[in-house]
């Protein structure tokens, strides 16, 4: 009898961790390498953040919090959505986690049933398919077109949708390519999604503020109000 569950046996070890560990080992050997694994910045935590954390500890803010985040933080996130994205959310619609990966994983575990499909544009963050598999879902990969900067088209999205599709997982700007969808490109994708009301939208907006050369970030619910009620937005603040 196997010790590991069949579900866990379906996933592979994290490539991100493997690459990060290899880079650390090579650096320890004195070799000059650039690590392209974990997204660790090359600067220290800013002093104002350090001091705020220290002040919170000294003020006794060391107890259990509400499982979905403290009220002040949820209110700040609501204000962020309104200020930067033109979206109105109430604190009850906000859930704070220990990281974006936990948000996506929890969502898949809470919503997927065996046979449910999740559409994932490629190239993609390496954890996406494994999280779907852990939720007993089926990853459906759409290959982005190199001539379009590894982005997908409305026709590719349309062709991937089936009656079993539960989620469309959308990441812009993209990890790993950095590709970002323009307002017009995103509008074209939302028009496809509006024709399929059984498909929910999960947006990984973690790189919202890593935008350069005049790129205007947009998120699906911002482009198409009709998607507001069936969109889960994951971001970092």
Name what the model sees in each region.
Residues 144-215:
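Active-site phosphate-binding strand-loop segment of PLP-dependent enzymes
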Residues 133-140:
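A short helix-loop-beta submotif of the ANL/AMP-binding
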Residues 110-132:
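Conserved PLP-anchoring active-site segment centered on the Schiff-base-forming lysine
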Residues 199-200, 216-237:
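Conserved active-site segment immediately N-terminal to the catalytic lysine
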Residues 116, 137, 193-200, 228-229:
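A short helix->loop->beta-strand "cap" motif at the edges of active sites that frequently abuts
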Residues 88-94, 114-117, 164, 228-231:
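Short acidic capping loops at alpha-helix termini that bridge into adjacent secondary structure
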Residues 5-99, 106:
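N-terminal small-domain helix-loop-helix segment of the aminotransferase-like
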